[in-house]
């Protein structure tokens, strides 16, 4: 892989921060090391001294005085070593990337912790995209991604999708505008990457099948583009047999995968992680060095202690409990939809995630109905146009989340929605 063509001039110009490098050395060095290098505040001056956090089953995470000093201090930009090590083993266990033992320059699997997967994705986009570059994604798409891409001045090319995710024939048809060898010629402007949420796509709830992933990956190899696998709902697949990931089939080192703890442990702790080829992950880490410096040390230690306490088996048991909860929530919103929206709208059963994507019949644009009329009735949902490149275009779709509302609240919300639809027809 020629990674240089996926790195902008600004990203290529980034050099390691000497101060951040010293922080990395200190974090891995013996406690006897005397440091006069970094501007680390004296931890004895921090007002917080200890903490005890109670978790499931009455177990506790302890922050004694020494641990608290570390938790409140600067830490390596890539993440604290014990969390990185645990996550690397998790990725090997779940995905077994072919690139684990590749030479670093040839795309060896690397990993870094980010302040939520959104931060990682933004830095990946900024690393790759020059104004005018072509990028591929499937609409409707996560609005946060669209808002990240628009200011970068890229051309977003929509790839058709259905209930099984991206349609490979649509991708193949788009790529036929170029010849495979055009990827070696910057003037041809071949697509830099394909972005997709493969499981429980936000907002549709669609999931890519294994067969389609294989077809898509082969097209990526043929036309030499990256795949950005944004997978925050990987652990919320209602069928607990998890579909193989792009990372698991990445023989070239062309997949950048974004994972998140937001949906299964905590959204407020803002801990996610990127996995991908070392030459690209290194560029992201260099960007972190001069922006946020590093993810929260305290939050990383809290999650790391929990994961080490659980072990992989305990972690997966927790994931199963989370899946069972959201599966019941999904059943509740589907029951409410069947009860109130039959004949007024159409939808399909989400394969993963926490959203129901609804198409209202007979109404070309539901924006006013959702943003004004429903709000006045005390019901909040999102109009579908927020998930398209052209957000000003009319859309008959809306997104309803089933993550937090009770079954009774979902029932009331859809009763209100049904009433408003009938009044608008």
From Swiss-Prot:
**Is Signal there in the keyword field?**
no
Polar residues bias: where?
A: 198-208
Output one GO MF annotation. Answer: 2-aminoadipate transaminase activity
Region called Disordered, residue ranges: 181-208
Enumerate the Pfam families for this protein: Aminotran_1_2
Q: Name one GO cellular component term.
A: mitochondrial matrix
pH dependence text:
Optimum pH is 7-9.
BP terms from Gene Ontology: 2-oxoglutarate metabolic process; alpha-amino acid metabolic process; biosynthetic process; glutamate metabolic process; kynurenine metabolic process; L-lysine catabolic process to acetyl-CoA via saccharopine
Supply the alphabetized keyword list.
Answer: Acetylation, Aminotransferase, Mitochondrion, Pyridoxal phosphate, Transferase, Transit peptide
Q: Which reaction does it catalyse?
A: glycine + 2-oxoglutarate = glyoxylate + L-glutamate; L-kynurenine + 2-oxoglutarate = kynurenate + L-glutamate + H2O; L-kynurenine + glyoxylate = kynurenate + glycine + H2O; 3-hydroxy-L-kynurenine + glyoxylate = xanthurenate + glycine + H2O
Describe the subunit structure.
Homodimer.
Protein known as? Kynurenine/alpha-aminoadipate aminotransferase, mitochondrial
Q: Which source organism?
A: Homo sapiens (Human)
């Amino acid at each position: 892989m020629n990674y240089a063509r996926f790195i902008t001039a600004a990203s290529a110009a980034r050099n390691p921060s000497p101060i951040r490098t010293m922080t990395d050395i200190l974090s891995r060095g013996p406690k006897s090391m005397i440091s006069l290098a970094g501007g680390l505040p004296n931890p004895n001056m921090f007002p917080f001294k200890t903490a005890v956090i109670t978790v499931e089953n009455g177990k506790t995470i302890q922050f004694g005085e020494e641990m608290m000093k570390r938790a409140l201090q600067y830490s390596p930009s890539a993440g604290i070593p014990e969390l990185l090590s645990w996550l690397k083993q998790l990725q090997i266990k779940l995905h077994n990337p072919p690139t684990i033992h590749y030479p670093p320059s040839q795309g060896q699997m690397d990993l870094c912790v980010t302040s939520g997967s959104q931060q990682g994705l933004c830095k990946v986009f900024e690393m790759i995209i020059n104004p005018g570059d072509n990028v591929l994604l499937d609409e409707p798409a996560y609005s946060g991604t669209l808002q990240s891409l628009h200011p970068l001045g890229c051309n977003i090319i929509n790839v058709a999708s259905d209930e099984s995710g991206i349609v490979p024939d649509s991708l193949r048809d788009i790529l036929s505008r170029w010849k495979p060898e055009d990827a070696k010629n910057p003037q041809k402007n071949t697509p830099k990457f394909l972005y997709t949420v493969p499981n429980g796509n936000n907002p549709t709830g669609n999931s890519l099948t294994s067969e389609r992933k294989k077809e898509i990956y082969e097209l990526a190899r043929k036309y030499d583009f990256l795949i950005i696998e944004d997978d925050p709902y990987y652990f919320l697949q209602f069928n607990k047999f998890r579909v193989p990931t792009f990372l698991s089939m990445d023989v070239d080192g062309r997949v950048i995968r974004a994972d998140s703890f937001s949906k299964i442990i905590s959204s407020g702790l803002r801990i996610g992680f990127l996995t991908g080829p070392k030459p690209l992950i290194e560029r992201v880490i260099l960007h972190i060095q001069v922006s946020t410096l590093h993810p929260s040390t305290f939050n990383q230690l809290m999650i790391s202690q929990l994961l080490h306490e659980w072990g992989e088996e305990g972690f997966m048991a927790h994931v199963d409990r989370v899946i069972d909860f959201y599966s019941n929530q999904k059943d509740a919103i589907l029951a409410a939809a069947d009860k109130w929206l039959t004949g007024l709208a159409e939808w399909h059963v989400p394969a993963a995630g926490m959203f129901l994507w609804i198409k209202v019949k007979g109404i070309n644009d539901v924006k006013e109905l959702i943003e004004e009329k429903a709000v006045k009735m005390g019901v909040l949902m999102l109009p579908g146009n927020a998930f398209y490149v052209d957000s000003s275009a009319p859309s008959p779709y809306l997104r309803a989340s089933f993550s937090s509302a009770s079954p009774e609240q979902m029932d009331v919300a859809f009763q209100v929605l049904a009433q408003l639809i009938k009044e608008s027809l």
